[in-house]
């Protein structure tokens, strides 16, 4: 079913990339490496390109029912994120989301899409970063930062650069937070 919707969005992006058409898709997006989830992520990216509007608020609610991006990130399954670090998909690219949809792995339903986690982390760091030491600890417990570190070995330079930037931002935010606590 998702494949059919995906084809329709690709053929008629001007007509289909409307908030009223994209919003119903967000609850079925799980952020995994399943082909259907990758197709949905491509639809969301197509929406952003067509409408020049962020779809981040839709994705925040879709994965965990969270009210904001930080809660969505903190509600990621740490075991699944760690599993994604171990079985990292080397073919996944940040700048080429529409390709490799034919690639499938038996664990895809149990792995997060590193692109999704990276984009969610970027949104959190840009909009609503953790504000307390407890939230930072919870963030590290999700293994999302570990996935950023693992993504540094990606073949895709854009993904590597994005992750370096995010890790740098995390380090700066931690230095500022702890300087306020101890300085």
Predicted regions: what they are:
Residues 13, 19, 24-27, 78, ...:
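Proline-rich intrinsically disordered, low-complexity coils
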Residues 23-30, 99-107, 145-153, 183:
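HEAT/HEAT-like alpha-solenoid repeats
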Residues 70-102, 112, 116-128, 177-183:
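Long alpha-helical HEAT/HEAT-like repeat alpha-solenoid scaffolds in very large eukaryotic proteins
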Residues 14-23, 97-98, 136-146, 179-183:
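Core helices of alpha-solenoid repeat scaffolds
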Residues 1-9, 18, 32, 36, ...:
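HEAT-repeat alpha-solenoid elements in large eukaryotic scaffold proteins
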